[in-house]
From Swiss-Prot:
The gene coding this protein: rplI
GO molecular function: rRNA binding; structural constituent of ribosome
A Pfam family annotated for this UniProt entry: Ribosomal_L9_N
InterPro entries found in the cross-reference section: Ribosomal_bL9 (IPR000244), Ribosomal_bL9/RNase_H1_N (IPR009027), Ribosomal_bL9_bac/chp (IPR020594), Ribosomal_bL9_C (IPR020069), Ribosomal_bL9_C_sf (IPR036791), Ribosomal_bL9_N (IPR020070), Ribosomal_bL9_N_sf (IPR036935)
Species annotation: Solibacter usitatus (strain Ellin6076)
Disulfide cysteine pairs (residue numbers): none
Family that this chain belongs to: Belongs to the bacterial ribosomal protein bL9 family.
GO biological process, one term: translation
Protein name according to UniProt: Large ribosomal subunit protein bL9
GO cellular component terms attached to this protein's record: ribonucleoprotein complex; ribosome
Keyword entries, A-Z: Ribonucleoprotein, Ribosomal protein, RNA-binding, rRNA-binding
Superkingdom of this protein's organism: Bacteria
Amino acid sequence: MEVILREDIENLGTRGQLVKVAPGYARNFLLPKRMAVAATEANRKIVEQERQAHLRKETKIKGEAEELAKIMTGVTVRISQKAGENDQLFGSVTSKDIADALTAQNYNIDRRKIQLDEPIKTLGEFKIPVRLYKDVVAEITVIVAKEE
């Protein structure tokens, strides 16, 4: 039986793809859970329209992310923390701290988009990538200074 997938299914296919499956698998699993629809001509047109709308939406979001990346590249964020004699911080600077500092500069960036491998624990200047979209990355500079 041929069905059109409405979402990505591991080991079967991706959203919008036409696949052949066993009739029982389609009737008992895919169709009741609305993971697929029967491959009729009307459903093919509907799925194609949904795919086009999804593609337009993705293109718009990516364009906005690219514009934001151009603006954000080169942005410098200064964070003051208490530190000891050997430039070791008492605590650390996390992606949440960086996101809060960016919000103070009117950049509303989710902390999960800040690609910080591990919290910053020393004073200094760091280049931090910010993943704004799947393949759109802006690089910001974070300066961690000693709090007076």
